């Protein structure tokens, strides 16, 4: 069967080239480079020296920005962990979108032609912030194009179409359970899933849980190498995270990430960041405020990233 037509990825330019460079670098490390056994249990390890060094800085950031901040980061080479409120719940928001496409990649190899199928949807199904899908109602979009849109520009209608293919929020949650994540849950669709006031458990995750899920899909053996490489391509091509984790890592690092935003100033970013030598660090930053009208502040996540990098390196 024909492979997936991903010619539209060429529009990503520099990010797509960066993804190729990362994969080439990993490819020099072994036959199944970049893959590690999936360890997806959603819990932190014992506090490490790295966590101790960063805790005061995270608390100071919370005070300065008036936000609650959750952090989980792991240097997958050294095993060092930074954790802060890592098992507390935050709104998942659009961070689900990369995981949802990972779920499809697990069930449908690229060579199957599944991602070439055209999905059609009505004008009535188009929700707010859908910059790609709103222009394609007449033609529909392939599954691959929907994944590209929902990851790289966080198109909400594309996210809902991917959820439909998975059996809705319940099907997505079942996928997370299959990874060993007994914590995260998705209950609603875009855009209602972004309404997560303090104390709400619907549509939530924890920094430790979401980091474990992205680690399993991007670095683990949940996906075969072609599908893992495709997911990395989409994440590295993301255009919505330049002021978050990407702004806090050193020059020369390559970041593949998925952002999210919601009510109460909710602001998230989950990433795999490859150092200049190709060593992967998984970083999950989740945040929110008590004021339902609060605005997100990307500087909080950028500064938290700098603290993570300092503690781990």
From Swiss-Prot:
Residue positions bearing lipid (S-diacylglycerol cysteine): 29
Gene Ontology cellular component list: plasma membrane
Membrane topology summary: Lipid-anchor
Protein name per UniProt: Beta-lactamase FAR-1
Keyword entries, A-Z: Antibiotic resistance, Cell membrane, Hydrolase, Lipoprotein, Membrane, Palmitate, Signal
Protein's cellular compartments: Cell membrane
Domain of life: Bacteria
Lipoprotein among keywords: yes
């Amino acid at each position: 069967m024909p492979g997936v037509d991903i010619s539209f990825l060429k529009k990503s330019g520099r990010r797509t080239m960066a993804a190729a460079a990362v994969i080439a670098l990993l490819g020099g490390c072994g036959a199944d480079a970049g893959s590690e056994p999936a360890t997806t249990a959603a819990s932190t390890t014992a506090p490490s020296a790295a966590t101790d060094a960063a805790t005061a800085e995270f608390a100071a950031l919370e005070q300065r920005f008036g936000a609650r901040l959750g952090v989980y980061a792991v240097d997958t080479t050294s095993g060092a962990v930074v954790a802060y409120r890592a098992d507390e719940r935050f709104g998942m928001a659009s961070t689900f979108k990369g995981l949802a496409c990972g779920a499809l990649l697990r069930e449908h190899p690229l060579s199957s032609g599944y991602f070439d199928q055209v999905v059609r949807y009505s004008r009535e199904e188009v929700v707010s912030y859908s910059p790609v899908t709103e222009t394609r109602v007449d033609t529909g979009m392939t599954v691959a194009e929907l994944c590209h849109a929902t990851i790289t520009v966080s198109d909400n209608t594309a996210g809902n179409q991917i959820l439909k293919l998975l059996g809705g929020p319940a099907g997505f949650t079942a996928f997370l359970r299959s990874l060993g994540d007994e914590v995260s849950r998705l209950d609603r669709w875009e855009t209602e899933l972004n309404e997560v006031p303090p104390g709400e458990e619907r549509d939530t995750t924890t920094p430790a849980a979401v980091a474990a899920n992205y680690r399993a899909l991007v670095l683990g053996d949940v996906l075969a190498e072609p599908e893992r490489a495709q997911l990395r391509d989409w994440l590295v091509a993301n255009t919505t995270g330049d002021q978050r984790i990407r702004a806090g890592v050193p020059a020369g690092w390559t970041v593949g990430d998925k952002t999210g935003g919601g009510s109460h100033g909710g602001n998230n970013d989950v990433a795999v960041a490859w150092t200049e030598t190709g060593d992967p660090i998984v970083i999950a930053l989740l945040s929110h405020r008590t004021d339902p009208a609060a605005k997100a502040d990307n500087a909080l996540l950028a500064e938290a990233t700098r603290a993570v990098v300092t503690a781990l390196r």
